[in-house]
Swiss-Prot record:
InterPro entries: MRS2-like. The gene is MRS2. Coiled coil: none annotated. High-conductance magnesium-selective channel that mediates the influx of magnesium into the mitochondrial matrix. Essential for the splicing of mRNA group II introns in mitochondria by affecting mitochondrial magnesium concentrations, which are critical for group II intron splicing. It also suppresses a variety of mitochondrial intron mutations and its absence may disturb the assembly of mitochondrial membrane complexes. Keywords: Ion transport, Magnesium, Membrane, Mitochondrion, Mitochondrion inner membrane, Transit peptide, Transmembrane, Transmembrane helix, Transport. One of its GO terms (biological process) is mitochondrial magnesium ion transmembrane transport. Residues 1-25 form a transit peptide. The keyword Methyltransferase does not apply. It comes from Eremothecium gossypii (strain ATCC 10895 / CBS 109.51 / FGSC 9923 / NRRL Y-1056) (Yeast). Belongs to the CorA metal ion transporter (MIT) (TC 1.A.35) family. This is Mitochondrial inner membrane magnesium transporter MRS2. A motif (CGMN) lies at residues 313-316. It is a multi-pass membrane protein. Homopentamer. Forms homooligomers. Interacts with MFM1.
Amino acid sequence: MLRWIPTRICPRLCTRGFASSCARLAQGPAFFVKPITPNDLFVSCTVFNEKGAVTGVSERYPKLSFLRDRGLYPRDLRKLDTSSIEVIPSIVVKPTCILVNLLHIKAVIEKNRVYVFDTTSKEAAARLGVLMYDLESKLASHSSQPAQHYEHRALESILVNVMTCLETEFKHLSKQCGLVLNELEDQIDRDKLRDLLIHSKDLTSFYQKSLLIRDMLDELLESDEDLAAMCLSPAPGTVEADAAEVEMLLETYYKQCDEYVQQSGSLLQNIKSTEDVVNIILDANRNSLMLFELKVTIYTLGFTVATLLPAFCGMNLKNFIEESVWGFGGVLAVSAVAGLAVTASNFKALRNVARLTVMNSHSTSPGAKNISSARLHLDRDVPTLWMRLKTAFRTIWFGKSRPSRDGRQRDMIWKWLLDDTSK
């Protein structure tokens, strides 16, 4: 139900970013819309006359007579249904009226009257309260400029309200997504990824919604017949001028809606890129853990093989080795060699498997550059026994803090220094 508040606006109208509109409303009287219960036999709407005054608040009309008086069909009323089911945005031009269905606004615009249908949603009711105030002010305004047609002023008020809602929602989503993306740059957390998924779904819904509105406005701009028919009260000889005025009006809000589409699409692309990078990092960490587990398993197997022979010799059975002078040394040497041999052979097999994996990840027919890159990755992740010995000796002799550089790296560093000096 619609009530007139004679003092300041209800604070609930200032929710979800309508602070700018509410600041205007706080200076004078405002509307407060309550959601209604749908009825299959009647339509409930608020009526504005040609002077912008409210002549009916939540007034109920029988559906059949409402359609018959305006030359509409039952299928036209489905687009203006007050149910919570969202319909594709549309502006349908009829001989005697214009049917508007944009987001939370469902209205019928005639040449001297506007019918704004009530809603069943509390959130949409708050937004309709802002529309009522703007619509009353716009329809009742009189200026020294050339008079704008009544139906065009009503349509402009509706488009302004729709674009304001889109702008508010996009700013909210952009802020939330930006915070999550900045946090993911510092640390990858499961809760942050869940928040990013939720915000991504909301942003995708906003993108689809704004895209449908933009395409609808584009279709209207492409149809000269609809532009001419949107002038419900044309003066003689001014049809072309009125059509041009409507075209300029729709084109202005088309560009604004297209801006929201482009910005939301760019933000969605950034989210997708971030998700791809996060997946790559998680895959790399998973592969590192698997490689570490394989290395631990190989070392454990080598240690087990090395202790197998001493375990046999340590049984309380006569084997005559304890009487030999070389028994202890021989068993120790054979065990160490067996353990190293098993470890080296397993690392060689792991290196071959890793080489095939890296080579296949580059391309079906890898070139010399890919082969060199694969070899570098193998030397870093799965070094050979000789490379391990060299690394251990270098660490013992020079210390771990000394970086290892070959001649090519030294020449490259000197080249960088000379280039910087010449600049």
